[in-house]
Regions:
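Nucleotide-sugar donor phosphate/pyrophosphate-binding loop at the beta->alpha transition
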Residues: 68-75, 110-111, 121-143, 156-160
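N-terminal strand-loop element at the rim of the active site
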Residues: 3-11, 15-69, 153-163, 169
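A short, active-site helix/loop in glycosyltransferases that binds the activated sugar's phosphate group
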Residues: 142-172, 177-183
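A short helix/loop element that forms part of the nucleotide-sugar donor recognition site in Leloir-type
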Residues: 43-47, 183-199
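Active-site proximal beta-strand in glycosyltransferases
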Residues: 2, 88, 104-120, 137, ...
Length: 205
C-alpha cells in the first residue's frame, strides 16, 4: 500500500497519512511518499518521527502547477510504484491526487483511492482555470476505485454542487486525531492557562 501526499507541511493531510501508515494492521506494508515544504511553510516531518514513520521525500513535487517539475514528479512516482509494487495507491489533496493517480493508472495499480482534504472549485481561481481543475478531477474520479470525503458537507459538494463523481463512489471518513496529549494534566493545564490570562474559574472561554 502506498500513501502519497502533496508535501510534508503542517496540516491535516500529514496527520491523516501518518496515522494511516502508523496504525494500519501489521498484515499490511505501507510506503508514505510526499513533497517537501516550500519556503515559509512549517515542516511537519517531526509528526512522522513521533509515530515512527519513515517517508520517501519527493522534492520534485511542488505546490504550484509547473510542467517541468510536475513531469519529473510523475516520472519519480512511477519509478517508486514500479519498485514497490503496491496493491493500493491512496492519494491525498489535489497535486498528489492528480500526479499520484495518473502514475497509478499508468502502472495498472489494482486499487486507487483519493481523499479530498479540501478543493479549489470556488474562490481560488478564475472561471477558466476552475473549469479546468474541475474537469481534471472529474476524469480522475471516473477511474478511481473510491473517493473519500472528510465530511458530509464535502461529500455533498463533490457529488451535487460540483458533480465530481456519483454518491455511490464516495465514502465519508472524518479525520482522526490522537487526543491523548490533550487529556494529560487537564486540570493543571486549565489552571495554568487561566492564571496566564487572568481568567476566573467560572469564566467561559
Amino acid at each position: 500500500r502506498e500513501e502519497i501526499i502533496n508535501r510534508f507541511n503542517i496540516g491535516g493531510p500529514t496527520y491523516n497519512a501518518t496515522f494511516l501508515t502508523a496504525f494500519l494492521s501489521d498484515k499490511f506494508e505501507t510506503l508514505l511518499v510526499g513533497g517537501i515544504p516550500e519556503k515559509g511553510e512549517a515542516d511537519s516531518l517531526h509528526i512522522l518521527e513521533e509515530y515512527g514513520v519513515k517517508a520517501t521525500l519527493l522534492p520534485e513535487m511542488k505546490r504550484k502547477p509547473n510542467f517541468f517539475s510536475d513531469k519529473k514528479a510523475l516520472k519519480k512516482i512511477k519509478e517508486i510504484i514500479k519498485e514497490y509494487k503496491p496493491d493500493i495507491v491512496h492519494t491525498h489533496a489535489s497535486k498528489a491526487g492528480a500526479l499520484g493517480r495518473k502514475a497509478a493508472f499508468d502502472c495498472s495499480v489494482p486499487i486507487v483511492v483519493h481523499t479530498f482534504h479540501g478543493h479549489v472549485f470556488h474562490s481560488y481561481f478564475g472561471k477558466a482555470k476552475t473549469f479546468l481543475f474541475r474537469f481534471i478531477e472529474q476524469q480522475l474520479a471516473k477511474r478511481s476505485t473510491g473517493i473519500i470525503a472528510i465530511s458530509e458537507i464535502q461529500k455533498q459538494e463533490l457529488t451535487e454542487a460540483y458533480k465530481i463523481c456519483s454518491k455511490s463512489k464516495v465514502k465519508v471518513i472524518p479525520l482522526g486525531f490522537d487526543l491523548e496529549k490533550f487529556r494529560q494534566n487537564k486540570t493543571e493545564n486549565r489552571k495554568k492557562i487561566r492564571d496566564q490570562y487572568k481568567l476566573n474559574d467560572e469564566d467561559v472561554v
